[in-house]
């Protein structure tokens, strides 16, 4: 019999495979469009997606560096913006023409992850009046390094509730790399901040857990404080633990127009001002040249040089001339324990009058932990520790209460007066931090 001829069969794909193939082609086309289109086309497309988004939408951004010249804004709840990685999807605002922020978010249930925001004219990522916010693996940076012309804030949530900022990076901010203000229920974890004026700022905020962060090579590592004349007062219940606040000795590059941050002494590890219920434990706080930890009331923090500059800008006028009767300027109920503190105060910043005067009185160096000793007159000065500052097991950290109210006439170096404990503060619980949280 003759050999049978090969069958001329045509391959067939199932409807499902055809759908998958079409989807892949569409995705590839979109990626090509994002990657190869003109910068203005990418910007227009992305802003259009943000304007037309619906709750539940995920806006995927491709790998690449994309140039934008105006603020991106979102006001729709329940949206996720997701890139391919903080060093792979880069939104560059170098040469920004319109708007101050890189991104301005006024929406609840918002997630942004795996994206970089670079070289904005003002703040990089601003989030306002929002609840249930997640910022994950986001890098904000001014790529020219420390410069007074950089934007003030990197990651900048204000008036938020249930906020998680994790695994993110901030570099080059002329005020704070990661700031949280007038907010409630906040977790800051595993972030890295460097070469900012202030690494972290926790301002007028209640219920915060800040842990496993690294703050290094900033002017100051972390500030925890309340300021007057802001809508929300009474920030408290702050836990700072398992962090590294080390080598924060970058010269202060904030412009005077930004107000108080201009006076932050170079070489400040952590400062705690005008706030209560703060627990600081299991941290490494080392080699900050002015002081490792500075605990002060508001009026000590605002030195004479600052007061002379109240007319410099509306910011300084508001902060340095407070008339807020709701405001409590005193610090109390602060518990520092089980920290590794050493090497602070070796080369204090003489640019700031108050630091210069204090260092001169102490022979040119400052202790690791510096406390002004100022308390509310109503607390009873006959008690040995009316402000309830408690210190315990902080390695061999040196200490001084420099008696600011008494003109430094009765300083106290003996830390034993402050060896006590306070009840541990409870953990901050927010839904999005539950996985892998502490």
Predicted regions and their residues:
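Right-handed parallel beta-helix
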Residues: 62, 84-87, 108-119, 131-144, ...
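Glycine-rich repeat segments that build the extracellular carbohydrate-interaction surface of secreted
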Residues: 49-68, 79-84
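Cysteine-centered motifs
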Residues: 23-24
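Acidic, glycine- and Ser/Thr-rich low-complexity intrinsically disordered tracts
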Residues: 301-438
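Extracellular beta-strand/beta-solenoid scaffold signature
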Residues: 46-47, 69, 93-103, 119-126, ...
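Right-handed parallel beta-helix/beta-spiral solenoid domain characteristic of secreted/periplasmic
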Residues: 37-44, 58, 78-122, 144
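C-terminal motif of bacterial Sec signal peptides marking the signal peptidase cleavage site
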Residues: 33-35
């Amino acid at each position: 019999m003759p050999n049978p001829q090969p069958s001329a069969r045509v391959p067939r794909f199932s409807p499902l495979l055809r759908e998958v193939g079409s989807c892949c082609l569409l995705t590839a086309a979109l990626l090509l469009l994002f990657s190869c289109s003109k910068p203005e086309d990418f910007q227009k497309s992305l802003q259009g997606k943000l304007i037309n988004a619906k709750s539940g939408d995920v806006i995927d951004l491709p790998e690449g560096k994309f140039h934008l010249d105006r603020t991106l804004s979102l006001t729709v709840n329940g949206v996720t913006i997701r890139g391919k990685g903080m060093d792979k999807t880069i939104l560059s605002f170098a040469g920004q023409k319109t708007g101050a922020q890189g991104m301005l978010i006024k929406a609840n249930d918002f997630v942004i992850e795996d994206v970089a925001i670079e070289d904005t004219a003002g703040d990089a990522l601003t989030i306002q009046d929002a609840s249930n916010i997640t910022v994950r693996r986001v890098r904000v940076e001014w790529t020219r390094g420390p410069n007074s012309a950089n934007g003030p804030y990197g990651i900048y949530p204000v008036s938020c509730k249930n906020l998680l900022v994790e695994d993110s990076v901030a570099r080059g901010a002329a005020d704070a790399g990661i700031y949280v203000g007038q907010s409630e229920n906040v977790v800051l974890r595993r972030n890295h901040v460097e070469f900012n004026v202030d690494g972290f700022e926790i301002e007028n905020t209640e219920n915060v857990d800040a842990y496993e962060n690294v703050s290094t090579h900033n002017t100051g590592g972390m500030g925890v404080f309340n300021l007057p004349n802001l809508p929300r007062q009474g920030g408290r219940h702050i836990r700072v633990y398992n962090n590294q606040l080390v080598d924060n000795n970058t010269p202060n590059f904030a412009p005077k127009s930004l107000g108080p941050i201009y006076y932050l002494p170079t070489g400040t590890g952590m400062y705690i001002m005008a706030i209560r219920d703060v627990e600081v434990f299991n941290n490494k706080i080392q080699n900050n040249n002015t002081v490792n930890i500075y605990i002060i009331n508001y009026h000590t923090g605002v030195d004479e040089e600052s007061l002379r500059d109240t007319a410099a800008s509306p910011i300084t006028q508001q902060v340095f001339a407070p008339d807020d009767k709701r405001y409590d300027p005193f610090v109390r109920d602060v518990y520092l324990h089980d920290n590794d503190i050493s090497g602070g105060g070796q080369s204090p910043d003489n640019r700031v009058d108050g630091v210069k005067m204090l260092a001169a009185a102490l022979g040119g160096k400052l202790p690791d932990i510096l406390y002004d000793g100022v308390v509310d007159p109503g607390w009873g000065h006959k008690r040995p520790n009316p402000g309830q500052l408690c210190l315990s097991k902080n390695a061999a950290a040196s200490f001084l209460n420099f008696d600011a109210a008494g003109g430094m006439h009765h300083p106290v170096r003996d830390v034993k007066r402050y060896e006590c404990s306070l009840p541990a503060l409870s953990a901050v619980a927010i839904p999005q931090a539950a996985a892998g949280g502490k």
